[in-house]
């Protein structure tokens, strides 16, 4: 899911992968129901879930079915831009918003580009 080890390597066109370089895998995030490896984060429930528990919880009724779940990176366990809405066959890749700000008042030629992930409200 992540870009890999090479800075020059570009992400796949379907996007949504981790923006950082995943050179060191982090400690796996645990599912809050079964204690397995979590693969999604539900913002509405504020819960990390594995695929099996996610299907069970969000298949319970039509209200839970509409929750947007963020997919975790398989290497670094950070949230990616890939989201699940409803069925696991329906993936959404959130756009990112780039803001440009000047670093100093004296040196106006230097600018920082900050990329902020889009989040559903």
Curated annotation (Swiss-Prot):
Motif placement: PFVFL: 117-121
GO molecular function: DNA-binding transcription factor activity; protein-macromolecule adaptor activity; transcription cis-regulatory region binding; zinc ion binding
Cellular component terms (Gene Ontology): nucleus
Domain of life: Eukaryota
GO BP annotations listed: circadian rhythm; regulation of DNA-templated transcription; regulation of flower development; response to UV-B
Zinc finger (B box-type) stretch: 26-72
Regulation: induction: Circadian-regulation. Peak of expression toward the end of the dark period in both long day and short day photoperiods.
Transmembrane segment boundaries: none
Xref: InterPro entries: CONSTANS-like_Bbox1, Znf_B-box
Tissue: Highly expressed in shoot apical meristems and in vascular tissues of leaves. Also detected in petioles.
Keywords in alphabetical order: Metal-binding, Zinc, Zinc-finger
Function: Developmental regulator acting by forming heterodimeric complexes, that sequester CO and CO-like (COL) proteins into non-functional complexes. Involved in the CO-mediated long-day flowering-promotion pathway. Engages CO and the transcriptional repressor TPL in a tripartite complex.
Record's protein name: B-box domain protein 31
Lineage of origin: Eukaryota, Viridiplantae, Streptophyta, Embryophyta, Tracheophyta
């Amino acid at each position: 899911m992540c870009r890999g080890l090479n800075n020059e390597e570009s992400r796949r066109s379907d996007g949504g992968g981790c923006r950082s370089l995943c050179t060191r895998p982090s400690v796996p995030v645990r599912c809050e129901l079964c204690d397995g490896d979590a693969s999604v984060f539900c913002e509405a429930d504020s819960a990390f879930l594995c695929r099996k528990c996610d299907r069970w919880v969000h298949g319970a009724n039509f209200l839970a079915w509409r929750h947007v779940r963020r997919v975790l990176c398989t290497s670094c366990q950070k949230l990616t831009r890939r989201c699940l809405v409803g069925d696991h066959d329906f993936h959404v890749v959130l756009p990112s918003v780039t803001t440009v700000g000047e670093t100093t008042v004296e040196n106006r030629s230097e600018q920082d580009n900050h990329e902020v992930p889009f989040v559903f409200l």
